[in-house]
């Protein structure tokens, strides 16, 4: 087989030259409480009220005495017409009634399947299956493609070809083999019949623990519409949307559902209220509610009832138009649109007040600077007497004092990082980016990465 040089980023490397910029913008938020305000009519009269609904031509106001009134938008002052135009009912409901819901709850309500991940040395690991065999995977947004550890690939039933391919990592190049992979699975999320690369992931790494069987790269994350949440310690997938370009953000939800009991009775209704031991069902077509002990329900319906809350119900049925981006920005996250080329994701920021492009890399336990860019931006770079390890072996590195690194409102000051020659093979004139934004800073800012919306979110306050 002809030897090909495959420029896969394995943990740290990209050869893409990017143009253009992307800047994060904070979205103005409403008050977290119902906003009673003075509305002024076109003839100058004022009334204190709460905006609760609107159509294209009318608005509905709730008055302090509890009554409501509907009037034409044209009867308001120009300023108040503009307020009504910008007002968003779904966002208002979310802010006032759904803010106690966690990111996990909000995404699972939206149909995402979630997996708890563990963090070791700032790396993210999840459990899954490789050809039906229990396996450990490292989540690496910096890896353009999924790569298997060659020993695990052989042990778990993959067909491994000759080592006639080459991949590149922080330590240089390493031989790799084209590998036929019947299946990689995490819960309901899976890929089948793929040809991927295998390599000795731990070669020349001292005391390597061989803690994982494969790196799940950006192409897998993109296919599964992944959301990675450091605060929740979870990764979320939408396996139902694989290969579906005409995707629906939120599946339709019927007004009523079937509740089944352990004595094989079925009731069609919806939860009206609940307490610690029972639920009260509003039965379809009946005026009287039915009370059922939780212990009488099937295990599946017990879980549904236990998870149910009025806030979840409001969000599911009345906030359907909100995107994941809307939800996170309303939760005080700052968003950054990233550039995604070659499966890698990049965001713009500043290193010592100089514009810098960062690669977002969950596989990098610590943020790393390109040594030449670090010098160009005024960082204090020490001697190259440190060593970093990765695919391809080891590479020299320098302890570097960083006065400031900023991304939007996220600011990291007086930090000590490592600098490495990230582009040694390309020459100094060919730089794809100036630094790697690693898991250390992402944990510090409770980062969320969304592949569907191509956004990175940081919580800066």
Question: How would you name each of these model-derived features?
Answer:
Residues 57-68, 279-289:
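Basic/aromatic-rich interaction segments and small domains that mediate binding to polyanionic partners
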Residues 1-10:
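Bacterial N-terminal signal peptides that target proteins for export
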Residues 9-20:
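Bacterial N-terminal signal peptides
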Residues 23-36:
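Cleaved targeting-peptide boundary
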Residues 26, 74-461:
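Pepsin/retropepsin-fold aspartyl endopeptidases
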Residues 34-42, 257-262:
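Short aromatic-glycine motifs in intrinsically disordered, low-complexity regions
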């Amino acid at each position: 087989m002809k030897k090909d040089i495959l420029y896969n980023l394995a943990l740290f490397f990209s050869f893409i030259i990017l143009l253009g910029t992307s800047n994060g913008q904070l979205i103005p938020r409403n008050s977290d409480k119902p906003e009673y305000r003075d509305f002024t009519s076109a003839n100058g009269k004022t009334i204190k009220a709460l905006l609760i609904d609107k159509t294209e031509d009318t608005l509905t106001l709730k008055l302090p005495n509890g009554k409501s009134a509907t009037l034409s938008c044209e009867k308001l002052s120009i300023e108040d017409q503009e307020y009504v135009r910008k007002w968003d009912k779904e966002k208002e409901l979310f802010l006032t009634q759904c803010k106690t819901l966690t990111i996990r709850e909000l995404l699972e309500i939206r149909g995402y399947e979630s997996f708890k991940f563990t963090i070791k040395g700032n790396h993210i690991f999840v459990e899954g299956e490789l050809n039906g065999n229990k396996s450990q995977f490292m989540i690496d947004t910096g890896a353009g493609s999924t790569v298997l550890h060659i020993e695990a690939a052989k042990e778990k039933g993959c067909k491994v070809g000759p080592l006639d391919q080459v991949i590149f990592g922080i330590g240089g190049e390493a031989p790799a083999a084209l590998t036929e992979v019947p299946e990689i699975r995490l819960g309901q999320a899976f890929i089948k019949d793929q040809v991927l690369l295998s390599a000795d992931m731990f070669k020349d790494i001292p005391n390597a623990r061989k803690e994982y069987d494969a790196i799940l790269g950006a192409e897998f994350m993109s296919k599964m519409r992944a959301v990675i949440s450091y605060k929740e310690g979870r990764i979320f997938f939408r396996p139902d949307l694989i290969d579906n370009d005409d995707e629906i953000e939120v599946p339709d939800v019927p007004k009523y559902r079937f509740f089944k009991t352990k004595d094989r009775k079925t009731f069609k209704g919806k939860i009206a209220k609940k307490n610690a031991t029972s639920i009260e069902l509003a039965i379809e077509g009946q005026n009287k509610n039915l009370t059922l002990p939780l212990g009488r329900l099937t295990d599946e319906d017990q879980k549904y009832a236990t998870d149910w809350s009025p806030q979840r119900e409001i969000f599911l049925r009345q906030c359907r138009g909100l995107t994941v981006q809307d939800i996170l920005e309303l939760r005080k996250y700052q968003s950054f649109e990233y550039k995604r080329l070659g499966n890698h994701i990049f965001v713009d920021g500043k290193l010592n007040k100089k514009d810098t492009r960062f690669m977002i890399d969950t596989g990098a336990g610590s943020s790393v600077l390109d040594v030449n860019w670090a010098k160009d931006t005024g960082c204090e770079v020490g001697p190259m007497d440190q060593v970093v390890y990765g695919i391809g072996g080891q590479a020299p590195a320098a302890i570097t004092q960083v006065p400031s690194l900023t991304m939007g409102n996220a600011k990291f000051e007086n930090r000590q990082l490592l600098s490495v020659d990230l582009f040694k093979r390309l020459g100094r004139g060919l730089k794809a980016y100036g630094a790697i934004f690693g898991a250390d800073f992402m944990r510090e800012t409770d980062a969320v990465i969304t592949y569907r919306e191509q956004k990175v979110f940081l919580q800066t306050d």
